[in-house]
Amino acid sequence: MIIFALIFGAIAIFTSFIYIEKVLPRLLCTFISGVILVGSIGGIVGNYYDHFGMHKVTETTIQKIYSADTTGKMNMILFQPIGTAGKENVYIFTRHENAKKVSHTKANEYTSNKITLTKGSEATLKTTKVRWQYKSNAYKFWFGIANNNNKLIKRTNRFYIPKNWFVLSTQQAKELKKKMSSSSFQAKAKEEAAAYVESKIKAAIVQDPSLMTDKNRQKKLTQQLAAEYQAKLLKETVSKIK
């Protein structure tokens, strides 16, 4: 609407100055038209540069997120450095359990990302967005043609990640996958896992002889120890590629 006021003011000031013969009415109409014209220009400039008629609105959302490993074998969040300086990262994760497609944060001048390690068991993403919004419908009516309502100023993504998760670059993840996929690594891991479980089972039987004849407990303990070794091996392998 402000554009129409600007056009009206320009036409009115021209018409008043040229076509109204009587001095007093001409001056009065020219003055009023000038106020409309200058006011419109001032409003447009103020809205464009200083967001006249607008205020900042903050919106915060919190959601549970899941591992970037869609196979479900590892709990991890990945990051990809962007820009030549490498000071900012795009983070990769999944938004739903058992999701086959990963999500990632935006890569633009409005977005910043932060990682906080927690003692909790769930990973969450807290997103805070700051936008420009019109203070009232009246301001929106006058300046809405600029299409700047709800314009994003800043987006902050804060990831709260459990300490037992891995935070890896995409390059590190590729190296890890390559290493763990090698036949020599898998053969060695299988051998070491068997030895680890066997030694722990023997130690448990020494402490509790009844375990020797309890096959169900042995099976459960074996599965627990195998998972324990897997986690230990994974942690050691990741530490070597960092």
Where are these regions (language model features)?
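Alpha-helical transmembrane signal-anchor/signal-peptide segments
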Residues: 46-72
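Juxtamembrane transmembrane-helix termini
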Residues: 18, 22-25, 49, 53
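Short extracytoplasmic
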Residues: 65-93
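Membrane-interfacial entry segments at the cytosolic side of transmembrane helices
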Residues: 25-33
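Membrane-embedded alpha-helical segments of integral membrane proteins
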Residues: 1-23, 42
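Extracytosolic and intramembrane catalytic regions of membrane-associated proteins
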Residues: 94-242
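Transmembrane alpha-helices and immediately adjacent membrane-cytoplasm interface residues
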Residues: 33-53
